[in-house]
Amino acid sequence: MICYNQQSSEPPTTKTCSEGQCYKKTWSDHRGTIIERGCACPNVKPGVKISCCSSDK
């Protein structure tokens, strides 16, 4: 499966993942809204929104 692999303001790239899921995490701090994308569907801390999917990108 192909997932986006991205940290906040960096341009999105793609990565082939064996986990079978992709995630997108968003949260806010003193820098503003932070977005992180990657493979799998990790557990997150309270206050962090996460969306997981099982289709490419």
Swiss-Prot record:
CDD domains in the record: TFP_snake_toxin (cd00206)
Job of this protein: Produces peripheral paralysis by blocking neuromuscular transmission at the postsynaptic site. Binds to and inhibits the endogenous nicotinic acetylcholine receptors (nAChR). This neurotoxin is lethal to mice by intraperitoneal or intravenous injection.
Pfam families: Toxin_cobra-type
SUPFAM superfamilies: Snake toxin-like (SSF57302)
Protein's name in the database: Three-finger toxin Tschuditoxin-I
Tissue: Expressed by the venom gland.
Gene Ontology molecular-function annotations: acetylcholine receptor inhibitor activity; ion channel regulator activity; toxin activity
Keywords: Acetylcholine receptor inhibiting toxin, Disulfide bond, Ion channel impairing toxin, Neurotoxin, Postsynaptic neurotoxin, Secreted, Toxin
One GO CC annotation: extracellular region
